[in-house]
Every structure is written in C-alpha cells, then in structure tokens.
Amino acid sequence: MEKMKATRNNMKYSVVMSVYAKDNPEWLKQAIDSLLNQTIQPDEIVIVEDGPLTLQLNVVMSQYKNSGIISIVRLKRNQGLGNALNIGIKYAKNELIGRMDSDDIAIPNRFQLQLAEFEKHSDLDILGGQIAEFVDDPEEIIGYRKVPVTHFEIKQFARRRSPFNHPTVMYKKSMIQQIGGYDASIIRLEDYDLWLRAIAKGAVCANLDDVILKYRSTTDAVKRRKTFISLRNHIRARIQFYKKGYISLSDLTYGLATQIILFMIPTKLAKFAFKKAVRE
C-alpha cells in the first residue's frame, strides 16, 4: 500500500485518446470510464476530437465536462490518427503518457502496473502489455494478443511485425517528440513506424507479461485490412522501412507476401489467419 501511495505522489501521468465521427458512443463511454476507474487515476486525460463529432458522441463527451481531469482538443477537420496523437502529445502536461483507443477497455490496474515498472526502471522509454480480445461482451474473451517482453525480443520481433499492442503503450513524451512523433504519412502503420524509429535511436523498450487491456475485435477491422487502399499503404510503408534500413530484404519479402495473401483470400479465412498470427 505504501508503494502504491509513493507511485501516486511521485509519478503523474497523462492519457491521450483520439475520437472521430465514426466512433461508437457507447464504446467511447466504456473506454473513458475504464480510465476514470483506474486504481491510480491519470492526472489528466487529453481527448483529441479529430474533426466534428456526431450529436451522440457530443452527448457522451458532455457527460465528462465536470470531471476535472479531461482536457478536450477540438480539430476543425479530420486529420487522421497520427496527427491527432501528435497534437494530443503536445498538449499533455506530463512526461509519462499512456495511449488509449476510444473503443477499448483498460484493466483497472493497468497504469498501476505500468507506473511501477517505470519507477523500477528509470531508463525505460516505451512500455506496452498484453491484450485480451472480445467482440460484444468484455467478459467473454475470445483470445489474446501476445507480444515479446524483453528489449532484445522486441528488437528481433520488430523486424517483421509491430512489437507493441498500440493501445497498451505508455511512453516518455520527451523521447517521442525527440524522434519526431508519429509520421502521419505512414497510414495504418504509423505506430509500427514509430517503434522502428525509436528502437533505431536507442529507446529502451519492454512489454509487461500481464493483460492490461481488453481489445474490441470487430469484423470491420479485418475488412479494412482487405481493401486495396490498405494493401497499398502497407506495401508503401514496408518499402520505406526497408529503404531506411530498419528491416532486411527477407523481412520486406515476408511482410509483402503476408499482406498480399491476406488481401486475396476470403474475409473469414483472413480473419482466422490474422488472429492466429497475432496470438502466436
């Protein structure tokens, strides 16, 4: 108990979340409530409204106007996740920033676990964790997305796949800004690009072995991966990674072949293949 109090007093943190017009109002409320119900509550929650919201989303947002810790940044037009997160990071007042998506649910002690790790390892720059997937009912878990735990394992894993579950990460603001933040031109893989650049610059990385977030799995997410635009974005991004020296030619070939196969096979089979890949 004493250790928890020390962490609460000495390590304040912000949470950055982006919301846009196509988000589900009920899911957004669940996401925000999961932040407010943390065993160690954030010092502030920065929510970037990425363009005008629907009436229903505005109703949800209005419920938290007197929370005392939620700061809202409104963008006149939709700028995409990368830009929205960069703006949120800029507005965040604390060095430690937790990421959160507008449709997921943070485990109650998520940030208590992450803060304890940052307190234990002062050189740590990026810390993620494991996620449990659900469809409709957060209590009915359909699977887990496992990522490597140690810095060495993360570096090896990152050559072919993103080594972090993006909505679970907590990172140092100074480090993220030092490497230029998210590259908004890397559509869909802006987080993967960020991790590769951070690792290349010597960032110290780790993942907790604990499940710290419940991730909402939808068929729409798989369908978006199977569009020609998504395939084109993945190909462009991976070629850039190769040109910058982040991945080898064999890593590039593996990544391109995987994306092309997922694009060509039926959606149900693609969903099965994707889930099998991220859970192994």
Show which residues each predicted segment covers:
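Nucleotide-sugar donor-binding/catalytic module of glycosyltransferases
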Residues: 2-227
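Non-catalytic, C-terminal membrane-associated alpha-helical segments of glycosyltransferases
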Residues: 220-280
